[in-house]
Amino acid sequence: MGGPKLLMPLRPRPWTCRTCLQRLHSARRSLKTAASPSPQSTSFEYNRSAHNTQKSTTDDETLRRVFDSPSFWKEFSQRSSLHTKPTGLVQNQYLTSPEGFRTFANVSLHKCQAIVHKVLAASTLEEYRDMARDLDRLSDLLCRVIDLSDFIRVIHPDPQVQEAATQAYALMFDYMNVLNTTTGLNDQLKKAAANPDVTSHWSAEEKIVAQILIKDFSNSAIHMPPNERQRFVNLSNEISQLGSNFVNAAEPAKSHVVVGTNSLRGLDPLLVQQIKRWNRTASVPTMGMIPRLVLRSVHDEGVRKDVYLATRTSSSRQIKRLEQLLAKRAELAQLSGYASFGHMTLSDKMAKSPEAVSNFLTSLVGSNRQFVHEELAQLQGMKGSSPLQAWDHAYYVHQRVMQYSQSRRSRELSIVPEFFSLGTVMQGLSRLFNRLYGVRLVPQETAPGETWNPDVRRLDVVDEAERHIAVIYCDLFSRPNKHPNPAHFTLRCSREISNQEVAECASMDQSAHPNDGMATAVDPQSKTLRQLPTIALVCDFPDPPATSAGRPSLLSEHSVRTLFHEMGHALHSILGQTRLQSISGTRCATDFAELPSVLMERFATAPEVLSMYARHWQTDQPLSENMMRSMEQDRTAHGSIYGAVENEAQILMALVDQAYHSVPAEAAGKIDSTAIYHQVSQAHSSLPEPSDTQPPTSWQGFFGHLYGYGATYYSYIFDRAIANKLWEDVFQSGQASVDRNAGERYKNEVLRWGGGRNGWDCVAGVLGSGNPSNADGRLVEGGDDAMREVGRWGLGRDGVSG
């Protein structure tokens, strides 16, 4: 792979929570933010001839039944096959067969080439004024193929379709790399952006997109002399290979720890038999689940210590890979004119610099420290007089959790999933969206060929005037060979379609559609055609049992929070509809991208929200207030056992990430990643790694996200701190969680801008100038002080992985 991509930088998902981190989101991208354009309306004319117009109450009941009743879903989904002509995947007119992917890619490629020719030949003032929109459309055409093909090749069960989608993806990806080396595009865009007679006619969105594209060109080394550009490409390829090896070849220095079987008391006897050897010893592996169970269960502290040290000591080969990766990144940054890789990566994020991130993280350590000490004091009391050690934590936490799980309240909570059928939770999401933002979810029959699996449900998002504003495909049930991790995919961004594009399609082919047949609507204000955001939600919930007399798929509280999290991303895409696709929805700064999803988790279990939807699947009885209180007490209890220590662990990982990526190029060749890791641990950990072992522990070799999220690992906890503040001050810790005024305030200041507004402007706007944390609007400026202020907001006690 080459360096960072200009028009559609294919990067890993900007940031994700603990469960998100392993999900496949390669088509998402991190974008930059600048000045603030005026937000666009997200209400469009609803095509009543093509969509269900039943009353919202009927839609609400249908929504529950399409997910909870297999027989109802079968009847509902088969209606369309009787009177609807076949269509392509997600309504794309080309994707009716595997061969259609090639046609789709070639048609899109032809359109791209025409735009490139127009941009390179531009000479008149009018042509330069069109340039930002033209290049945004070029990006959209690339994304149309790459995003959708990348998703289909992962999710579709048919190998022929997978292969066809992979070929379409490769064709457009290769062409994108050609564009990244087309210097004329960069030269023409810079010429347009430097001309006041051009920029005075650009909207604020066009100015932002132009600056984003110029920055992406710069990140692709297009401005460098040929020899330096080639070095940039070579370094990027080396980094890609080293990073892939680092992630995939993680290995401990020792593969096993040999202990006496008698010293494994506390471990499940079946597991002991599994690892037992012939001479009364057992071979404990140092990777996988077994060593975790040993640390959690074995009474012998000496065994726990040996296993702990072995599981946190990487092989010398793995450490060498990491240090080579860090050195190459530092060299790449120096070649690009930056002091370090961290400075290069953070220049277009909310944080702006490694120093600001460190301010945030050290401030966060302080706000979290008291809670950590309280948790460790409880564990120390359980251990007794000898000091609590790092290898003791999992053991005593497990004991406390087991003690709590035997309590009456904990046993009572075993019936909570009975109130969280999947259909009921989807009802709750729709009701919440309607209450806060005036939009709801409407089940829609699919045409033959529209979905990749018969279990996929389509939901149309409509506003209070019954206008269609988005499409969501819900692939939520488990099936063989399906990727198990929950995920949100934007298959197509929102964008304004010009009259010129409509005319172009009409001239090409009578059957051609300006959005390839996918969902469109007319903006009632501007009367322009728009492509609607098309989203896929993928989860792995169990199918409703076939032999349980109508029992639906029931979700744990954790699964409910996960679904709300992913719907938070979807909500950003639904409401963040801009005229240009490069800044629509989730295409915002990396360290702002998780805010809507993290905040959305807080709504899942707020009593005010639970009362709107949590009902027993069989009796329809609402979840009682006593049960809601028990759920809250349960979360508080678990948080008080391990939440703050988990928070500290995440903070330390982010500090290590910053330390590694702040090393300048001249020092990168001598980097000692293990020494840096221990320096951070000793300085900031309340339960630091032992410093006197030989060899010293080197857990950083297992920290695979150093590659995918280099210099940005702080982003999730940063957004979590902001989300906690918004929950407390805007939604009043849940008391305003169904209040329309609070919802409108959040929508207007945060969601509807997509990536078209600086994240600090969004935070300052939603908090208001009267908030003590934003006195006189000081958060707007961002910088070190603002980052430190966010650190003071803290993370609460739920634990990052809660």
UniProtKB/Swiss-Prot annotation:
What organism is listed for this UniProt entry?
A: Aspergillus terreus (strain NIH 2624 / FGSC A1156)
- Family matches, as InterPro entries: M3A_MIP, MetalloPept_cat_dom_sf, Neurolysin/TOP_dom2, Pept_M3A_M3B, Pept_M3A_M3B_dom
Q: Which Gene3D superfamilies match?
A: Collagenase (Catalytic Domain), Neurolysin, domain 3
Origin organism lineage: Eukaryota, Fungi, Dikarya, Ascomycota, Pezizomycotina
Short name of any one Pfam family annotated for the protein: Peptidase_M3
Give the cofactor note text.
Binds 1 zinc ion.
Any single GO BP term: peptide metabolic process
* Catalytic class of the enzyme: hydrolase
| Gene Ontology molecular-function annotations | metal ion binding; metalloendopeptidase activity
Q: Where is the transit peptide?
A: 1-24
Q: Where is the composition biased (Polar residues)?
A: 33-56
Tell me which residues bind Zn(2+).
H565, H569, H572
Q: What is its EC number?
A: 3.4.24.59
State the CDD domains in the record.
M3A_MIP
Enumerate the subcellular locations listed in this protein's record, separating them with semicolons.
Mitochondrion matrix
Signal sequence extent: none
Gene field: oct1
Its family remark reads: Belongs to the peptidase M3 family.
Free-text function comment from the UniProt entry: Cleaves proteins, imported into the mitochondrion, to their mature size. While most mitochondrial precursor proteins are processed to the mature form in one step by mitochondrial processing peptidase (MPP), the sequential cleavage by MIP of an octapeptide after initial processing by MPP is a required step for a subgroup of nuclear-encoded precursor proteins destined for the matrix or the inner membrane.
From the Swiss-Prot or TrEMBL record, give the protein name. Answer: Mitochondrial intermediate peptidase
Name the predominant localization.
mitochondrion
